[in-house]
Amino acid sequence: MPSTVAPAIPAAAGLFAPRLRAMTVGSVALISLLAFEALAVGTAMPTVARSLDGLALYGIAFGGPFATGVLAMVVSGIWCDARGPRGPMWHGVAWFVVGLLIAGTAPVMSALVVGRAVQGFGSGLLSVALYVIVGQAYPQDLHRRIFAAFAAAWVVPSLVGPAIAGLIVQYLGWRWVFLAVPAVAVPAVLLIHPGLRSLGRSVATSPVAGAAARIGWACGAAVSAALLHIGGQQRGVTALVLIAVAVVGLLVCAPRLLPAGFLRAARGLPTVVGLRGLASAAFVGAEVVIPLMLSRERSLSPTAAGLVLTVGALAWSVGSWLQGRIPVPASRASLPRAGLTCITVGTATVALAVLPELPIMVAVLGWAVAGLGMGLLYPSLSVLTLELSAPGEQGRNSSSLQLGDNLFAATVLALTGAVLAAGSAPGPASYTLTLVMAAGLALLGALLAGRVVTGGSVRPVG
């Protein structure tokens, strides 16, 4: 088993202690850039497709980077465990930047699709490497705070990213949505570099066991994920066939990439990964329905419906901040259970807003509660993942956590799209069904939350 030597850093000094300051700023900046690019592309892509006459490749432009990201997460986990996070970090930034440059200078849509796929691979390498860096560079009692900072780094772009991207497209042109990001990504990773040098190299002398098989299963999962994403954007029989094939592929491949015992919610890490997937699926599945429901059933403008989502994002940030400041609960299950309970109650409350007799504030308050739950849950599950990982397992387990998140969310998004497209037009019944499904997933997670506790002592990180 590989081992690493982490530097001794006084936890009391906080995230901005002299030896952590640059790494904290650089890591949070990279997370923000990954989030901004993921959100900004959705705003820019209609203009891109028109400009490059590439509407036929529109779905692949989104499904491609999702698929390569799935593959990269597995590769990064193996690489981090075998050689430490420095290689995946540098290569991740390189692939991310090169992909953005290819996309930003693409003369035709097919070139942009290639750039997006390269960018997605870099994002997958980076996302796992950053988790491993947290496990090796930060003292354990700062993990809740750094993951809260990571959560905020995702939330802020969700508030301002689409608007900024729209302004860039309108006044500078769509290419700058891609070309502007490398100017910040390179300085951000340079800030992290000194801290990476102090982590020490892995002393592994042989490849991680089963690496080739994991990469093979990851390729299968990546293809299935791409089909799932593309199928979710189709209609009719085509959508059903693509989604069915993709789900079968994921059922075959994904369990080989997730912790043993995942499907039966075994205690410890398998349940941690499962809860992350259930929460992501519940939240994202509800999030895509809410604006449509409020605009069609309650006659809200797109701006007003979007503000409801903004309230949820702000509540997510508040929840992340709170979990990093409150005393460590006596039971490791407390924060995950509280978070999933909030998501359950909040999502079910939003479903009531389909009734015209109830005020719109029901939806606002419900989604705020759900967002608060996500803020309590996500960082706490990230912390648990590192606590349940020996040094040579941090990459694989961080990869599993993020894979579960992405694959669960993609599956529910595709199924939600199929439900909404089943009739001639979505109505109260379909909105209620999708929101109840989302609440049910969160409720299942809340009932399983006690199984994150292994019954034995939790391994320290580092």
What residues fall within each predicted segment?
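Hydrophobic transmembrane-helix bundles of small-molecule transporters
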Residues: Q170-R276, A282, E287
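Intrinsic disorder in cytosolic terminal tails and internal cytosolic loops
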Residues: M1-R19, R201-T205, R451-G462
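Helix-loop-helix hairpins in multi-pass membrane proteins, especially solute transporters
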Residues: C80-P207
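Small-residue hotspots at the loop-to-helix junctions and early N-terminal turns
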Residues: A49, D53-I60, A148, P302-G306, ...
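Short helix-loop-helix connector
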Residues: A49-D53, A106, G122, A137-P139, ...
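Membrane-interface helix termini in secondary transporters
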Residues: T47, G77-A82, L167, R325
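12-transmembrane solute porter fold
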Residues: L20-T43, F62-P65, L71-V75, R86, ...
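Structural signature of hydrophobic alpha-helical transmembrane segments
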Residues: F62-G64, G115-L125, R175-P187, A239-A246, ...
